[in-house]
């Protein structure tokens, strides 16, 4: 389980100094219907004849690499950058911190 705080003080390239950054998890945007590859694929698929490209079925990985999106909280900066961290099965953003000697409650 990887637990990352929602804010982090780190270097901002635009400000040129360490600033607090808001941390969110990167998510892939929706694929465009008008990208060249998609247009070519749709054209090829139209009409008679079935699936024209192989459907990938040999998945190798069980996890994805976590990518953090850091946004500077300075009002007139707001620059964003990505930061990749290692693979993990469970990722948590801003969860409770572990305390030493605490009793585990269910």
From Swiss-Prot:
Chief location bin: cytoplasm
BP GO annotations: translation
GO MF annotation terms: structural constituent of ribosome
Chain intervals for the UniProt region annotation (Disordered): 34-53
InterPro entries hit by this protein: Ribosomal_eL44 (IPR000552), Ribosomal_LSU_eL42 (IPR053708), Ribosomal_zn-bd (IPR011332)
Keyword entries, A-Z: Cytoplasm, Methylation, Ribonucleoprotein, Ribosomal protein
Gene3D superfamilies: 3.10.450.80
Domain of life: Eukaryota
Disulfide bonding pattern of the chain: none
Record's protein name: Large ribosomal subunit protein eL42
């Amino acid at each position: 389980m990887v637990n990352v705080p929602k804010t982090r003080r780190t270097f901002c390239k635009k400000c040129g100094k360490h600033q607090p950054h808001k941390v969110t998890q990167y998510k892939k945007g929706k694929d465009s219907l008008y990208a060249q590859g998609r247009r070519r694929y749709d054209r090829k698929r139209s009409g008679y004849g079935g699936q024209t490209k192989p459907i990938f079925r040999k998945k190798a990985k069980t996890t994805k690499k976590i990518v953090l999106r850091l946004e500077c909280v300075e009002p007139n900066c707001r620059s964003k950058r990505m930061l990749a961290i290692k693979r993990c099965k469970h990722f948590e953003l801003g969860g409770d911190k572990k305390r030493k000697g605490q009793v585990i409650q269910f």
